[in-house]
Amino acid sequence: MKHKNIKLIITLLIFIITISIIFNTNKKSSKITDSSTKFEKIPIANKTVTVQWNENSPEVTIQNNYIANFILDVDNNCYNINLTVNVINDSNDTWNEIYFRDYPSAFSDKENGKVSEITNLHDTQTNTSLELIKNEDPTVFSVKLASPLLPTELTSISFDYKAYVPNLNARYGYQTINNNSKDFYLANCIPILCPYENGKFQYYPYFAVGECFYSKMANYDVTVTIPKSYTLIATGDNTEITNINDNLIK
């Protein structure tokens, strides 16, 4: 991919946004489970961090981890992510499903994006295929676990995710600038876990103005692949930059 005459900016702001109460009505299921085969579980290397807002605030333990390999397709205004999520059941209840918020799917008309695509959904410990359940709200989906997740237990799931960026001057969108070059703004671009509170997963309807996002903090390890002619501006610590052909990997 070649882009000339201007240095373009991508803003990747990974906001931790979540919300989920799931009802069993109006759900569409893509079932690809195989319960007949048993696998030996692979141990999960999970990172746990304890933080404080200030010296007077209580400590908060961050246990959920996202490992994302993000590739931006500037020609087709979309991106692909291979995403692994390590999830700890921090409640007193047993979970048979876990729920995600998928905000990019809010832009579902043909000119301003599409509903995202999720494939290759599986349990990373056993390599068992998992069931994807679509909610009536396109920004919500759930994953049926291979086995019940008891309190304090850890599981890890992985899937391939493709999302389409709308033509919008907003925190999630792209703008065409001089010489048909583009700026991409990619806030809330990764699916995130919904908090579990009061006996259920919490989510609220998406609305365009204001803040409707609710989630818990998590650890993010993100690898971003962009054209060399682009500059990445993002939160977090930049650990390494690699050049491969016409791409820049950070």
Regions found by a protein language model. Give the residues of each.
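N-terminal Sec-pathway targeting helices
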Residues: 1-12
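N-terminal, polar/Ser/Thr-rich
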Residues: 7, 15-17, 21-80
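A surface-exposed beta-strand-loop module
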Residues: 39, 108-180, 246
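Solvent-exposed beta-hairpin/edge-strand motifs
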Residues: 46, 95-128, 187, 225-230
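Intrinsic-disorder/low-complexity, polar/charged segments enriched in Ser/Thr/Lys/Arg/Asp/Glu/Gln
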Residues: 65-67, 78-84, 97, 140, ...
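Beta-strand-rich interaction surfaces with strong enrichment in secreted/lumenal proteins
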Residues: 68-71, 85, 130-132, 144-149, ...
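Asparagine-centered strand-capping/turn motif at beta-strand->loop junctions
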Residues: 87-92
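Extended, low-hydrophobicity, Ser/Thr/Pro/Gly-biased non-transmembrane segments
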Residues: 160-250
